[in-house]
Every structure is written in structure tokens, then in C-alpha cells.
Regions:
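Cysteine-centric segments in proteins
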Residues: 1-67
Length: 67
């Protein structure tokens, strides 16, 4: 799976900016400027912010993905 030349791994580390923790999400798919992932059964949709940075929000928390 590739987006604009970036290889997308099956498991992706994302950083929660609210509690300063890093967690792994499972890649599901991508479409346009969004990447769908799964965090322990919870769907997270990361939107492209800039360059290789994607951001998702869930339950009041922000998650950042760098590819």
C-alpha cells in the first residue's frame, strides 16, 4: 500500500498529543486524503494535514501519524 510514494505499513505507530503516548494502529485502507485505521476495534480516520502528517480525533483526543 502506497500513498504519494510513501509505503504504508500494516501496523503504524501514532502519537496521542493529549497524553503523550504512542500506540499502534492497524492500517485498513486509504481514499483521497484520508487513511482508515483500527485502534483495538475502534475505527480512526486520519485526515491529511501536510506533507506526510495525518491527524485523527477520537473521544476528545488527537492522534498524529507521520509516514
Amino acid at each position: 500500500n502506497r500513498i504519494e510514494g510513501y509505503e504504508i505499513p500494516e501496523l503504524i505507530e501514532v502519537h496521542c498529543t493529549d497524553n503523550d503516548q504512542t500506540v499502534e494502529v492497524q492500517y485498513i485502507s486509504h481514499h483521497n486524503n484520508m487513511i482508515r485505521t483500527d485502534l483495538q476495534g475502534i475505527p480512526l480516520h486520519f485526515n491529511h494535514l501536510k506533507r506526510n502528517i495525518y491527524v485523527a480525533n477520537f473521544s476528545g483526543r488527537e492522534f498524529v501519524m507521520k509516514l
